[in-house]
Regions:
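Structural signature of FAD isoalloxazine-binding scaffolds in flavoprotein oxidoreductases
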Residues: 27-36
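Short, surface-exposed connector motifs at secondary-structure boundaries
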Residues: 67-75
Length: 140
């Protein structure tokens, strides 16, 4: 079973409120895969906990997803103030010899907004009423 089919079978959906099926979002070819690890919601630390405690799994999954989408550039975008998370992910990238890179975002709200993230990471601007895919990016 392909990775895309596994994602579909698992019923994975986005957490942005609309519940958009992840397999549909990732069924594309892009230049950039950006993993949104900015975690802008006040008092939430789930992503941060995962980055510290499951860093190798995150890096491996990002690399696999990047390969699946044909991404030439794979980034985990997180806030520059996340020192422990940056250290854990950096070690995981080295240990796994992964093509994944970290992008350190400024610590502001809403750093995790898709349009802001695309612009910060790639320098590209998503057109009005557009989506990141319009400029060769997918955010996960």
């Amino acid at each position: 079973m392909t990775l895309l089919k596994q994602i579909e079978a698992a019923g994975i959906v986005g957490c942005g409120g609309a519940g958009f099926p992840t397999h549909k979002k990732l069924n594309c070819k892009v230049e950039y895969l950006i993993v949104n690890a900015a975690e802008c919601e006040p008092l939430l630390r789930t992503d941060r906990w995962l980055m510290v405690n499951k860093a190798e799994e995150i890096v491996t999954a990002a690399a696999m997803t990047g390969a699946m989408t044909g991404a030439a550039h794979i980034y985990i975008a997180l806030k520059e103030t996340y020192d422990e998370e940056i250290n854990a992910l950096t070690e995981a990238i080295k240990k796994t010899a992964s093509p994944v890179k970290l992008f350190r975002m400024k610590n502001f709200y809403p750093a995790g907004d898709e349009q802001i993230m695309v612009c910060d990471v790639t320098g590209r601007t998503v057109p009005p009423s557009g989506i990141p895919l319009d400029v060769g990016c997918v955010i996960s």
